[in-house]
Amino acid sequence: MKNFYMMLAAVAAMTFSAQAQAYWDEIEIGDFENATEFFGGSYWDSAPTTFYLAHTGVQMIYTTEELSGVQGTPYVDIKALTFKMYNAEAFEDMTRDVKIYMQAIDESQFAVVDGVKQFFNFENLVYSGQETYDLLSYYGDDMELRYELQEPFRLAKGKNLLVTMVYDALDDDNCTSSRFDTEFYTSGITGKAMTYTDNWTSFLDYAMGEDFPDAAAMQGCGTNVDLPVTKIEVSFTPPTGIDEVKAATTGDDAYYNLMGQKFTGNMPAGIYIHNGQKVIVK
């Protein structure tokens, strides 16, 4: 039996030295599939946007705690973001220019200067596109907004993720008649997002003005906003070498075989990736 596992280890080493295998996973912030709670309060308390106004911006901090599912790997490549919205009563098309910026940061909170919360300076555009949301097709139903990044963003282990999103209407009148016509689902994780809302001025222009980085209520900013339920699609390449030998698992942890297939619960004996490490399951 000992020789059998030594042989498996040798095969694994040859396999991974010959070709680095990328693995895919999804990280859910909040209960994405079964979300029931919406953002409360004013229209400026909704992330990643509100269709009630023509121009919005949002900054969201996803900490290592929220991203714990990938922290066993040296890094992950973020491929896409998906948010979930309920279309209560809107039936017209909404067209927006959408831009997404991503940065790795050490901070887990927004700074406060003279009692005023501060936006982060932002850079590193990873998505830019014009999106038309066909709300009539989702009248009275859930709708997912998925954004596939034009280039993957690499996030190193131990870093927090700052996501800045800008939505600009092509026509300032292209808005819903009520803040409650379209509502995004909240994760319940409070204080990790801040918003900007205006019917005439883009967040990009605001970021170039003298009031930035202040997030003042008089500027239509929400400063204690929940993270929305979010699905983050990632890929990662595990390190080489066998790290440990395990008995067949019965838990809910994710294991990947050498073909990149995902397993949970009991699985056949073999070589798997678990928490960014190669393990032998016997």
PLM regions: where:
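Aromatic- and Gly/Pro-enriched, solvent-exposed loop/edge beta-strand patches characteristic
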Residues: K99-G188
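Beta-sheet-rich sandwich/jelly-roll-like modules and their strand-loop junctions
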Residues: Q21-E107, L170, T186-P238
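Bacterial Sec-dependent N-terminal signal peptides
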Residues: M1-W24
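Residue-level detector of functionally pivotal "anchor" positions at catalytic/ligand-binding pockets or at interdomain
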Residues: I232-M259
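Short, flexible beta-strand-to-coil junctions
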Residues: M85-N87, M165-D172, H274-K278
